[in-house]
Amino acid sequence: NNSIVVGTGNKVEDFGIGFYTKYGDGGVDISPIADLMKSEVFKISKALQINDEIIDAKPTDGLWDDDRSDEDQIGATYNDWELIMNILENGVDPDEIAEELKGKYDIYIKHHMANKHKMIGIPICKIPKELKS
């Protein structure tokens, strides 16, 4: 029907900690905000005059019957993740990260490494031509 699935993941969720379901909310054709940090999405939302109720809503994946937020599940705030991602993108040695961020850095790395498979394309096994015939 000439349609595409548009993703809603931001850079922190999609390429930082991989906080999405690979073939669920990660199964998209285009992801227009995936290069924006969560704070940048908020700034754009305010500039576009998106309803404050939407902007101020607690981020949640909606998979639980309680009120746990993304941040409750992940163990840190989106601001923490952004700070750590910015530090890493600027080439700072992880050993130089401030002591108060070390625990959150460790959580970030744990999530990032566990979910890295979501952030790369599907691996393809190249079959030699002679085996195909």
Spans of features found by a protein language model:
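ATP/NTP-dependent adenylation/nucleotidyl-transfer catalytic domains that generate, transfer
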Residues: 1-133
